[in-house]
Amino acid sequence: MKSAEWFEASTEEERVEIQRKVARKVRLEPLDDVDAVAGVDVSYRGEEYRAAAVVLDPETYEVLDRRVVHGTTDVPYEPGFLAFREGPPALEALEGLDFDLLFVHGHGVAHPRRAGLASHLGVALDVPTIGVARRPLVGRSKEEPSRIGDTTPLVHRGEVVGYLVRTDAEARPVVVSPGHRCNLEDAVRWTLRLVRVGKWPEPLRLADLLSRRGASRVEGESRGAGVRR
């Protein structure tokens, strides 16, 4: 299938079938060397969207590349089917960018059919992806992690599908799950490694800023942020 075809469905039955195909393609495996990390996010105002992607050097946090696209969509938000709304704008924003790992504001395999937005994008582009979300879509955890760096497994149908990860002492934990070509351990490790300010990994934080506020703000934020210890 071509990249865009992973997101083309007109009925719920078609969306579910595509998700099942995505889940069958997903591979959870250790990451190879990572020299460039991307983040992608989509912001909305009504039916209008602004999708942004930012590529960083994971050692220096230098912004290596970025891209913003605008458009409209008539695909509504439905829990469990976010990929069909945000996937096409995200694909467009990522077009032409080079990176070794992609962070996605959404879920990977921590999804009812193991096929969240991060898994969709990973399979469509055949790149390693990690999903980072605000709250669980599926699964249960025994407790919230209490200290920065602590994690708690998220279990769904007897399987660990992700982790609650405490990345900020003042904010709720994020939900981390691998999307494609990445395993659970590397998803957590890279998420914690790349948090500098607030609760989100830096590629996602800057992609969110770019989608909402523009390139000049991203450049200033990137230069001014200190590395968290």
From Swiss-Prot:
UniProt subcellular location: Cytoplasm
Site keyed Interaction with target DNA: positions: Y77
A GO molecular-function annotation: deoxyribonuclease V activity
GO CC field: cytoplasm
Protein EC: 3.1.21.7
Protein family membership: Belongs to the endonuclease V family.
Entry protein name: Endonuclease V
Source organism (scientific name): Methanopyrus kandleri (strain AV19 / DSM 6324 / JCM 9639 / NBRC 100938)
